[in-house]
Amino acid sequence: NTISISGYHIREAGSTAVQEIAFTLSNGKAYCIAAQKKGLDINQFGQRLSFFFNAHNNFFEEVAKFRAARRMWAKITSELGATDVRAQMLRFHTQTGGSTLTAQQPKNNISRVTLQALAAVLGGTQSLHTNGYDEALSLPTEEAAKVALRTQQIIGYESGVTDTVDPLAGSYFIETL
């Protein structure tokens, strides 16, 4: 990717889900405008942009955040002149929220990370990093790293959520968030 636009650190610093998306997409729009001022075609460079988001604790809010961000980015790029669908796509990576992990009962973080990861997948993330359950204490141990990997594998291969492109499409609750 030519440019990766990050909102992860914004959320880790205490922003809301809405602020994370607002600032990150605004940064992306600023990159697009700057590139266009230099004569670059958004249909060419737009498909090389990627984003990096945080998955936090409020499950449904996170799913809705990612879904809304995808629609908003398509609208932003379209308004900037993108006609190629690939240039309008929000390609993004998600990492589970490090600031949500607790040191007092680290194994409870397994559930937190699992729900955050599932929210990201249901929201349409293209790649995912799951934090180790003990990262509130130190660098993840080998066991914690393995649990984080297995969490992704269970979601991807055993839960069935990846069997359809958009399993929550049409959900009144998600759409109204």
Give a label for each model feature.
Residues G14-A22, H56-A68, T96-I110, S138-V147, ...:
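Short glycine/threonine-rich loop-to-helix capping motif typified by GTGT followed
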Residues E79, I110-T114, L137:
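Hydrophobic alpha-helical bundle architecture
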Residues T16-T24, Q36, K65-A69, S78, ...:
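Peripheral terminal and linker regions in Fe-S/redox and tRNA-modifying enzymes
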Residues N1-H56, E61, L80-T83, Q88-H93, ...:
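Catalytic alpha/beta active-site cores
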Residues S26-I33, P106-T125, V147-G156:
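Glycine-rich and small/hydrophobic secondary-structure elements
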Residues I76-S78, T102:
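Outer-membrane beta-barrel translocator/pore domains, especially the C-terminal barrels
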Residues Q126-L177:
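Active-site or pore-adjacent capping/gating segments
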